[in-house]
Amino acid sequence: MKTRILLMMFAGSMAAVAADKPDSKLVAKGKVLFQTKICFTCHQVDPALPAPAGLALKASKFVGDFWGKKRQVQLDADPKTPVFEPSGKFEEVVLDDKYFMESVEKPMLKVVKDAIPGMAPLPTTAEERKALLAFVKSLSKPKK
């Protein structure tokens, strides 16, 4: 009985480790999509190469240790319209899977504080959004 419990605990811990490891094919697909959907124009992913439009728009950078970190966002006053209307209301969010997907699907719903709203909704499938998520998440490097 003890052996069975230990085996179940070991299997569970191995599954957790595997879940944290990114799928390399999905990351590669996300990288291609990041380029073909021109995300790189606004979102910097290389510390040595600034994103041209991103500097002016103060767009989110995907460099360094950013995943799982908190950020302030301003809420849209009228989420039913496709145009961002500043509400003056701010909320703290964590850059995680849920917030990333929401930002890609509804970019005007919550805009990072001090950023200029301008990201158009991307015509993407659910699978493409998962690939973009995997790529962006893979870029976050914890500080040593």
Stretches found by the model and what they are:
Residues 2-8:
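Sec-dependent signal peptide recognition
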Residues 16-35, 50, 93-94:
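Electrostatic cytochrome c docking/interface patches
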Residues 8-18:
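Hydrophobic h-region of N-terminal signal peptides that target proteins for export
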